[in-house]
Amino acid sequence: MNDAKKYIVSVLILLVAGMFGGCIKEDYSDCPRPFRLTVRAWDADMQDITETGAVQRVVIFVFDETGRRIDRLMMDAAQVAARKPIPLEYDGPTTVSFVAWANPDDHMLEETANVQNVKDLFFRLSSTDGIAQSPGDLFSGVLTCPIEYGSIEQGTDQTVDIYRRTAQVHIIIRGYQEWLEANGPRQLPDYADILLGETPDTYTGLAELIGNAVQYRPDGQIQNGDFISPIFRVYPTLDTTPLHLKLYAYGQELLNISTGSDGVPFIPVIGKMLNIYIDLRGANLNVLVSVTPWDVVQQYAEY
């Protein structure tokens, strides 16, 4: 093929592409401007933690002005930490809403994969018989922005800000083994149980709490006669209702505690850690409660 024929073929390809692409060079009025989207993560103290690795993955649902899903995007930890922009272009809607959720577990991703409308988007905890699995370190955020038309030049870059949606809990129960032995001869886990609750089990896509009430079972261990839980996460309660920590033996609820000895309630704070310290060793029950920054366990003086 000589140069003249190559030129003619190239021109024809460009003309056909222009006809089907909808953006003719002589008239850009119907052309959506491309733009870029980035994700930015914040902690409870409004510190930018995008680059810390706290966000492992993000799923971003894109809805038009009617709430209909038009796209679904995924980002991994490296992309988020590097603030890598996603190039986007949407032709048709006047506005789009980006509904971003970070660190959903595989079950949540599977449940939301085929959602086609924002009103049907929920992030529900896995649970059995009212006992929920501890959620991951969930973040979420929503950004609504107009789609710019009339040019093929780069449009305004956009950033969706995401914030933590769970609270951490850490529990220490001094003298727990001795207390158990005083209430029966058997060993864990045959007859004893510890439950913390209740919270709703569901977030809507727009981060509103709904759903059924659930409890959590701390997966702790007995160390030198004391029960010590790992750090675990819970959904917040409704209307700052306090959590109740219940201790069972032989299926009977023997203790139900919802406040410290000073009256401070067990209220989980989003993006913070709720520390619960219970001392069963003395004649009188002693309960301490404090709220500390994320991942910071309260150190209690021993006496």
From Swiss-Prot:
The gene is fimB. Coiled coil: none annotated. This is Major fimbrium anchoring subunit FimB. It is a lipid-anchor. The lineage of its organism: Bacteria, Pseudomonadati, Bacteroidota, Bacteroidia, Bacteroidales. Anchoring subunit of the major fimbriae. Regulates fimbrial length. These filamentous pili are attached to the cell surface; they mediate biofilm formation, adhesion onto host cells and onto other bacteria that are part of the oral microbiome. Fimbriae of P.gingivalis are major virulence factors. A lipid is attached at residue 23 (S-diacylglycerol cysteine). It is found in: Cell outer membrane. Keywords: Cell outer membrane, Lipoprotein, Membrane, Palmitate, Signal. The name (major fimbrium subunit) does not indicate the abundance of the protein, but is derived from the greater length of the major fimbriae. In strain ATCC 33277 and strain ATCC BAA-1703 / FDC 381, major fimbriae are 300 - 1600 nM in length and about 5 nm in diameter. In contrast, minor fimbriae are only about 80 - 120 nm long. This length difference is observed only in a small number of strains, including strain ATCC 33277 and strain ATCC BAA-1703 / FDC 381, and is due to a loss of function mutation in FimB, a protein that restricts fimbrial length in other strains. One of its GO terms (cellular component) is cell outer membrane. InterPro entries: FimB/Mfa2/Mfa3. It comes from Porphyromonas gingivalis (strain ATCC BAA-308 / W83). Gene3D superfamilies: 2.60.40.2100. Residues 1-22 form the signal peptide. A lipid is attached at residue 23 (N-palmitoyl cysteine). It comes from the Bacteria. The keyword Lipoprotein applies. Its main location: membrane. Belongs to the bacteroidetes fimbrillin superfamily. FimB/Mfa2 family.
